[in-house]
From Swiss-Prot:
Protein name: Galactofuranosyltransferase GlfT2
Broad class of where this protein is predominantly found: membrane
Family per record: Belongs to the glycosyltransferase 2 family.
Entry cofactors: Mn(2+); Mg(2+)
Species this protein is from: Mycolicibacterium smegmatis (strain ATCC 700084 / mc(2)155) (Mycobacterium smegmatis)
Coiled coil: none
Gene Ontology cellular component terms for the protein in this record: plasma membrane
Pathway in which this enzyme or protein is active: Cell wall biogenesis; cell wall polysaccharide biosynthesis
Residues that hold Mn(2+) according to the record: 267, 269, 408
Length: 646
């Protein structure tokens, strides 16, 4: 196709054959920052555009609306890389008089004009205009979008991105939702699946693994949500086996008791944009070869913020991180997609390749699930990353698809790096590293040693204690994972409760007022000399005995964001606010405990260094057992499933 801007396709026969993604509009009453995920309106417009439905838009006369937005621009480079398509078709149906202009971006973020045409729809019905855009120029990055400039009042009846050929395979999705004591969230997720008729059509089964004591079926809204799903919904009660146990049950039931072609993993505590399911499904069906298709994560509390475009595992220290050319926490309300001058926005136009996708939303083809087997028995953390790495070793890629997304609570509102979950972070990181990493373990151990020192300087003794247990349990071998799948979490919480930094108090007023009223906030040390000086002073302080009075009355009260090692390394008693702001913990320095924990950690790290190569072989030999259906049946099939009918 020519690079010269051109007009619309001839109106004879539509080239829009198979829907890839609809243009979707904000819900009624959405705030401005959320609206910017869907449309960008010119400041010269006389009034805001109004969306009567999720797929139609009313625009005033003499107005300009751009669809260069997160949900409505087309991520062309991902379709160029992963799909069989050579072109994509934009179809817009509207009444009124307007002009539709189509643009694309390069991997640098620079805007290129593709073409445009006037459109006039009157009387009998809307006029349709189509543009077919070549995907060849999108090897390294780029999006496609369109703008509408109106002369008269215009109603966009529908718009969407289409393939010019029929979709291969079948649309037959089994949706799986593990839940634990979140009945309201689970019911909302179930209701969302039937809120959109096109989404409802492609869902053949909904599998809920309910692992809590507060059951979803007992929620007042459950009956209505279940009635809409009919006999497609099944509830499976089981002990609390964590996310990995919940998703393993989903995969087990989907493969054994449905004829689904796609298995969609979804968290219970999310808000989903329903069209995301159709977008992931379209990528699944048009893929050159079977792939895992993941949705991205938006921040539930700051809805215009994208968590990250994609993630990889850093092979230097075997820790997940943002993929190359990706950054965390992009605010689309502040930095719009078409802002080519903003460095953060430019990165959004580069295609990001990933190692895995979070299981907040991830579509797995049946073929891959049958070949790879079940998730690992990890309870929580790293199970999704491991499955992506395992898939990659079998030749199956993972795509984190822009524009397919859910809203989920941000990690910044959680203390999971220091609370009981820190055990699973480390133990499972070691397990997955043993299975899928051939690099020197020195990088991983060095990063953990650095983290241990920081935890001790921050008086996070409970974190170090459970991480020592994590190393011990990893070295106990793979056979141990199933035997402690249900018991590890309560055991870890019990161990952690022995330390004051694990006890959450209602607030700082639960204790006497802080004694040091003159202490100033310490500036963040940036230069190496400043870091060295602060560290040396902190270490010297750690060698001294603590003042017993500081374990009765804290010296200072510190906010979460200020609880850094250089702020806490020279105090003996301090309250620190929890990440969610709902309480405080009273951290207390204890030289004897600190040295005992440090010695235990160094011993375990030395054991890791000596034994890690042998553990690689042990875990890899055990992988067929860890992922086998038969082994999982022994822990999953403990209660009778409930089939929910109309």
């Amino acid at each position: 196709m020519s690079d010269i801007p051109s007009g619309a396709l001839e109106a004879d026969e539509s080239r829009a054959v198979s829907l890839l993604s609809r243009v979707i509009l904000p819900r009624p009453g959405e705030p401005l920052d959320v609206r910017k995920l869907y449309i960008e309106e010119s400041t010269t417009n006389s009034r805001r555009a109004h969306a009567p439905t999720r797929t139609s838009l009313e625009i005033g006369p003499e107005s300009e609306v751009s669809f260069a937005t997160y949900f409505n621009a087309f991520p062309a480079s991902y379709w160029r890389r992963w799909s069989t398509l050579d072109t994509v078709v934009l179809r817009v149906e509207l009444t009124g008089t307007a002009r539709v202009d189509v643009y694309r971006s390069k991997a640098t973020g620079a805007r290129i004009t593709v073409g445009g045409a006037p459109v006039a729809g009157e009387g009998d019905g809307p006029a349709a205009v189509e543009f077919e855009i070549d995907l060849t120029p999108f090897e390294d990055g780029g999006w496609i979008w369109f703008d509408i400039t109106t002369n008269t009042a215009v109603r966009v009846h529908s718009a969407g991105w289409y393939a010019p050929v029929p979709a291969p395979g079948r649309a037959n999705v089994a949706v799986g939702i593990p839940t634990f004591n979140r009945p309201a969230d689970c019911v909302n997720a179930l209701a969302a699946l039937t809120s959109d008729p096109l989404v409802d059509e492609v869902i053949s089964a909904v599998i809920v693994s309910d692992q809590g004591t507060s059951k979803a079926k007992d929620h007042p809204g459950f009956a209505d949500a279940a009635a809409r799903l009919g006999d497609r919904l099944s509830i499976h009660n089981q002990p609390n086996l964590g996310g990995s146990g919940g998703y393993s049950r989903v995969m087990y039931e989907a493969l054994k008791n449905t004829d689904c072609e796609q298995i969609l993993f979804m968290d219970d505590d999310i808000r989903i944009e329903p069209d995301s399911i159709l977008r992931a499904l379209a990528m699944n069906r048009f893929a050159k070869s079977p792939i895992l298709v993941g949705g991205q994560m938006l921040n539930l509390q700051e809805p215009s913020h994208l968590h990250v475009m994609g993630e990889v595992v850093d092979r230097a220290n075997f820790m997940w991180t943002a993929a190359p050319n990706a950054e965390y926490d992009h605010d689309f309300a502040k930095f719009k997609l078409s802002d080519a001058e903003e460095p953060r926005t430019k990165l959004l136009h580069r295609r990001v390749d990933v190692d895995f996708n979070g299981w907040w939303m991830c579509m797995i083809p049946r073929q891959i699930a049958e070949e790879l087997g079940q998730p690992l028995p990890l309870f929580i953390k790293w199970d999704d990353a491991e499955y992506g790495l395992r898939a990659g070793e079998h030749g199956y890629g993972t795509v984190t698809l822009p524009g397919a997304a859910i809203w989920h609570m941000a990690w910044s509102d959680k203390d999971d790096a220091i609370d009981w979950q820190a055990y699973f972070h480390l133990r499972n990181r070691l397990v997955v590293a043993a299975l899928h990493w051939d690099g020197p373990v020195s990088g991983l151990i060095a990063s953990h040693l650095k983290a241990t020192i920081k935890h001790l300087l921050c008086l996070e003794y409970s974190t170090v204690a459970i991480q020592n247990k994590a190393m011990e349990d990893f070295l106990a071998g793979p056979e141990n994972l199933f035997s402690i799948l249900e018991s590890a979490m309560p055991d870890v919480r019990k161990l952690r409760s022995q330390y004051p930094d694990a006890v959450v108090l209602p607030g700082a007023t639960s204790l006497p007022p802080a004694s040091d009223m003159r202490r100033k906030k310490i500036a963040i040390p940036v230069s190496k000399p400043a870091i060295a000086v602060n560290l040396a002073r902190g270490v010297v302080h750690q060698l001294r005995s603590h003042d017993p009075e500081t374990h009765v009355r804290p010296q200072i009260n510190v906010a979460t964001q200020d609880a850094r090692w250089f702020s806490l390394c020279r105090v003996d008693g301090v309250t620190v606010t929890t990440a969610d702001g709902r309480g405080v913990v009273y951290r207390q320095r204890d030289r004897a405990k600190m040295f005992a924990l440090l010695r235990a950690s160094l011993r375990q790290q030395a054991r890791l260094a000596r034994k890690f190569d042998r553990m690689r072989k042990v875990y890899r030999d055990a992988l067929p057992m860890l992922t086998s259906t038969q082994k999982w049946e022994s822990v999953l099939l403990t209660e009778t499933p409930e089939k929910v009918g109309r």
